[in-house]
Amino acid sequence: MSTLTRLLFLLAIFAGAIASAQWKKTPLQAPAQPNPQLYREDANAGADINRALVAAARQHKRVLLDFGGNWCIDCHVLDNAFHQPRIAPLLNDNFVLVHVNVGQYDKNLDIAKRYKANLEKGVPSLAVLSARGEVLYSTEDFERARVLSEEDVIAFLDKWKPPAPAASPAKK
């Protein structure tokens, strides 16, 4: 067998292994009993966000805004993922989560606009804020949460969690 043939053979095996690993990702699941008040009708989103910013500053976290509605299956799928054993600690240790109710796209649209949440593709839509309220990232990548995996959510949270505090110099 020529060197080129061996190389192509090894590349084919490697590509197959990667494809197999990708195929095994398990899609997120809807909860058995969706929370009918996940996005509270009576919530004051502006006040909730302000409280989250104060808590985030005090706890050295970021704020994760989750724009959605109680009618939205993908919103419940994503929230269910947030409670899974591999995801919950990552979320809770690094973010203050605020659910922002957009109703039937008729509530809190000013807040969605302020935080650059693009609702045109659907919900859930997420925005990551610094503890000072700066929009670090805004995405509509979760509007089809049912096709995402736990690994996708973990990768997103890992990417946007706050940086580890700088190590203080050793005292002499």
At which residue positions do the language-model features occur?
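Short active-site neighborhood of thiol/selenol oxidoreductases, capturing the structured segment around
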Residues: 59-72
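Non-catalytic, surface beta->alpha helical segment in thiol-disulfide oxidoreductase systems
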Residues: 121-165
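N-terminal leader/targeting and pre-domain segments
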Residues: 23-59
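Bacterial N-terminal signal peptides
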Residues: 8-17
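Thiol-based oxidoreductase modules, predominantly thioredoxin-like and allied folds used
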Residues: 80, 87-109
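Structural alpha/beta surface segment adjacent to cysteine/selenocysteine redox centers
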Residues: 106-123
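Bacterial N-terminal signal peptides that target proteins for export
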Residues: 1-8
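Conserved redox-active cysteine motifs that mediate thiol-disulfide chemistry
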Residues: 69-82
